[in-house]
A protein has these predicted regions:
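Glycine/serine-rich phosphate-binding loop and adjoining beta1-alpha1 elements at the start
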Residues: 1-29, 45
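Short hydrophobic core segments
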Residues: 4-14, 48-49, 69, 131-141, ...
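A short alpha-helix-loop-beta-strand transition element characteristic
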Residues: 16-18, 157-160, 207-217, 241-246
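A conserved FAD-binding loop/helix module that cradles the flavin
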Residues: 83-89, 93, 174, 180-238, ...
């Protein structure tokens, strides 16, 4: 085994798909997200086990391609960190796309079987249900790719999912060793991981650096796309903050009609008294791009009036901000 030494070390090895020895993963009949591009054919039916971000992304992609998808997860709620109304809309659209959701259901068995139309996979649920599907995507999370690092030699120990614990400066328990990205856990996004790497390097070498983690935008590439930044209705309610909501639907906007997205929506949360913008949630085409307009206003402590007083190009989806702002202000009055 090779050894490496340095005054400062940053661990950024990412993650790998979580595997279970009891699951007969073969890369084709039962596969993980890492195997998708190697599939030999498009299945007619697919069961996705795990409704995390990756499981949802692939479930909606396959469903959009015409595959009959069943989604299983032992949790009754999906993506609990996302605004509930946005998730409700996503779930509605998934069902409209002929997807079957088995939430609150745990898998107790999975085995390849022979069928009259070829090989199949039989999945048993603890509730007694059985699902027979052409293929199964096993997506129950990711594990830190730390297995080959010999962390013990450096005085570090990962948790049960291979992740490394860090402080707010991204330092591990060993002060000159830092860790960033997916290997430290949520939110496990490429964008946030890059920012964590920048901050870790600055902290390691005493360079002043500012960042606002509470304003990190999250992009979830389901179909339709989701992006959020700032507070949600649930977090504001839990904190006892008086707030109001403004909404705009893509079907109300010329660009939404042009591109044929009649289901997208943009939602603003703002303080009911000061009108300060508190959060933005978007579902639909271009959500992860549109979110940055709201992110900029949030970063500068702006109010919902910014959108009312600003002219947006026509026809663009950005006009949703103005429509949503008018909707919210009208609710106040």
């Amino acid at each position: 085994m090779r050894e490496a030494g340095a005054g400062v070390i940053v661990i950024a090895v990412g993650t790998e798909t979580t595997r279970d020895d009891s699951v007969p993963l073969d890369g084709q009949r039962v596969f993980t997200s890492d195997d998708v591009l190697g599939l030999d054919a498009m299945p007619r039916s697919l069961t996705v086990i795990g409704a995390g971000v990756i499981g949802l992304e692939y479930a909606t992609i396959f469903a959009t391609l015409g595959v009959r998808v069943t989604l299983i997860d032992k949790r009754r709620e999906i993506l609990s960190f996302v605004d509930t109304e946005i998730i409700d809309s996503l779930v509605h659209q998934m069902r409209q796309n002929r997807m079957t959701l088995r939430l609150g259901e745990a898998v107790c068995g999975l085995e390849p079987v022979a069928g009259p139309k070829g090989p199949r996979v039989r999945i048993g649920l603890e509730s007694g249900k059985q699902i027979v599907t052409e293929r199964a995507l096993y997506s129950v999370g990711r594990t830190g790719a730390t297995g080959g690092l010999n962390l013990a030699a450096a005085g570090l120990a990962p948790d049960e999912r291979g992740r490394i614990v860090v402080n707010d400066r991204f330092q591990t328990a060993v002060p000159h060793i830092y860790a960033v990205g997916d290997v430290i856990g949520f939110p496990s996004l490429a964008s946030t991981s890059m920012e964590q790497g920048r901050l870790a390097a600055c902290n390691a070498f005493g360079v002043m650096a500012d960042s606002v983690p509470e304003l990190f935008p999250y992009g979830i590439y389901t179909i339709p796309e989701i992006s959020i930044v700032g507070e949600s209705e649930e977090s504001l309610t839990a904190a006892g903050v008086p707030y109001e909501v403004g909404k705009a639907f893509y079907r109300e906007i010329a660009r939404g009609q042009i591109i044929g997205d009649n289901t997208g929506m943009l939602k603003l949360m703002f303080h009911a008294e000061t009108r300060q913008l508190l959060g933005v949630a978007i579902l639909g085409e271009g959500a992860s791009d549109l979110i940055h307009i709201g992110q900029a206003v949030l970063a500068h402590g702006g109010t919902v009036d910014y959108f009312i007083n600003t002219v947006f190009n026509y026809p663009t989806l950005a006009e949703c901000y103005k429509t949503a702002a008018f909707d919210g202000i009208n609710r106040l009055e």
